[in-house]
């Protein structure tokens, strides 16, 4: 190859965000299509360990813009792909998301969501389903639903209704889950 072709290939890589590392079979089978893993950092010391059993519960309490996917859902997708990208097998990825307070609207059925948000469709539905398919436990606070006058039947079918987010968070942490957020 001549120098011009090499320079063009390198420029294209920089322009489109490709790293210089060799892609592995794992990269082709990331659990969350359309979500890149965290970018590689040359020399980084702390990396996901394929031998560790990751138990993580994300507290989804923040209010999101009604027309946008909840940012914490994107973070969960990125985290799942980062674990997979670094060789952590599916059997070692135990991820839960607990929706409560302002985050509870993200798991509402589309008709209920539209009624609460001036006709806006629930932008979270597809990603929630993909997360569930990737093995993420999706939970919502039953007390929060009562407070918003929402029936359990008005929650998406991929989401488990629990008595109270506080109890869910405590129970998961007692089972060894590490809490992220909220």
Model-derived features with residue positions:
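Histidine-anchored nucleotide/phosphate-binding helix
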Residues: 69-88
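Acidic helix-start/capping segments at beta-turn-to-alpha-helix junctions
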Residues: 89-107
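Acidic/histidine-rich, surface-exposed loop or edge segments in extracytoplasmic proteins
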Residues: 49-65, 108-112
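Bacterial N-terminal signal peptides that target proteins for export
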Residues: 1-8
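A cross-taxonomic marker for long C-terminal extensions/tails that follow the last structured domain
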Residues: 26-37, 108-182
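Solvent-exposed, acidic/flexible segments
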Residues: 62-72, 90, 117, 121, ...
């Amino acid at each position: 190859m001549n120098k011009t072709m090499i320079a063009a290939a390198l420029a294209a890589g920089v322009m489109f965000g490709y790293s210089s590392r060799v892609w592995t079979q794992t990269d082709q089978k990331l659990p969350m299509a359309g979500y890149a893993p965290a970018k590689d950092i040359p020399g980084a010391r702390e990396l996901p360990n394929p031998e560790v059993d990751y138990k993580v519960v994300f507290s989804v309490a923040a209010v999101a813009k009604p027309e946008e996917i909840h940012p914490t859902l994107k973070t969960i997708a990125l985290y799942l792909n980062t674990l997979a990208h670094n060789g952590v097998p599916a059997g070692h990825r135990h991820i839960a998301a607990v929706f409560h307070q302002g985050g509870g609207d993200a798991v509402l059925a589309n008709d209920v969501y539209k009624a609460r948000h001036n006709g806006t469709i629930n932008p979270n539905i597809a990603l929630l389903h993909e997360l569930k398919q990737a093995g993420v436990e999706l939970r919502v606070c039953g007390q929060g639903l009562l407070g918003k006058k929402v029936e359990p039947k008005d929650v998406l079918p991929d989401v488990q209704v629990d008595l109270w987010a506080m109890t869910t968070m405590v129970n998961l942490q007692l089972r060894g889950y590490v809490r992220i957020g909220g």
